[in-house]
Amino acid sequence: MERPKDIWHFARPLLAKQYLGEFDLGLISARALFAKRRMGKSTLLERDLIPAAQQAGYITPYLNLWTATQTPAQALLRIISSAVAPKGWSKILKRLKGMKSVKTSAALKGIVEGKLEMEWEGLAATVATPLLGDLLNELPSRQRMLLVLDEAQVLARPEHSELAHSLRANLDSRKASIKVIFAGSSEVTLRQMFGRVQEPFYNWAPLTPFPLLGEEFVHALTQLVNRLSRYALTGRETLEAFEALGRTPEFFRLYLSRYLAYASEGSAAALAHTRAEVYNDTSLQRTWQSLPPLDRAVLQLIARGVTDVFSAAVRGQIGKGLGESAPSIGIVQKAVGRLTRGEILVRVERGEYHVQDDVFLEWLKRPT
């Protein structure tokens, strides 16, 4: 079924064509893209690249790994099985039935009963990971696949190392027919993922910045607003709003939505409301409240520019703020580790960390 037309989507067909053209030339079989969240990566992948690939004859399994941080192997099985089904199911089911570890599992029962899309997540990772190769083997030799993995930095987590090695091995032998787009929001993690010798995907895909939206995007949406409203916006007003919102497309659309609803109040009022909404998001408060007091203290210091959170002076400051004795280096390291695994912090240099999400950073720096 075709997706309903979205008049607010700023199509980028030339960029989609460029990425597919690189694969058609045969010089590369994968590409990795990075940009911060909310900058339009997923929109391009889902609304421009995937439809263009489908028109070119690719099957296009897509997975946002941020939705499957605990079960990426099972999620990959689900999207790939949907792409190659039903041809590959019989062999997969035969193999599953022969595995003692899953013979009586609810997951297998669901799969046998035909609930394939829903039940892969019930399999253990040790079962799901080896099945990836079996599914890919069922891909017809002339059928091309574009595998799109969004928030791909999830694969760099230590607990997913076996999956990453297996995926690399399976894709290595199928470069002619399977092309891959990795996209992610953590530049540092992706650089480590593709640039460290010890990582499974070392040198496997060129890593490049995602081309960000700019004045052309702002101009197109400004024209659309002016066709819909009797209170016209000027190009200067919308460009200033775009800059004030960190050149973030998602926030700019919120600003336009507010303006259309209350156009008589003017652009400045719409921008002020949008900034208040963005930087006081209840989800940020929930994230903050979910953190242990020590993690909050460390995060607050890093947000305010403190670099050496392991020094005696800073640890003393942390302890004083918590009404306790200074935590040890090891205790602070554990807090930093939790924040890093939760993708709240990202390491930029040895011992130096930054807040990954700009919106959260601004929220942390606000006056209290």
List the predicted regions and their residue ranges.
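N-terminal pre-P-loop "Q-motif" helix
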Residues: 7-20
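Phosphate-binding P-loop
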Residues: 21-28
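P-loop NTPase nucleotide-binding core
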Residues: 29-31, 35-39, 43-146, 155, ...
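Alpha-helical DNA-recognition elements
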Residues: 51, 258, 338
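Conserved Walker B catalytic segment
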Residues: 118-186, 195
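Helix-loop-helix "sensor" segment of P-loop NTPases
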Residues: 192-240
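Amphipathic alpha-helical "lid/sensor" segments that cap RecA-like P-loop NTPase cores
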Residues: 223-284, 293
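C-terminal leucine-rich, beta-strand-based interaction scaffolds used for sensing/assembly
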Residues: 282-368
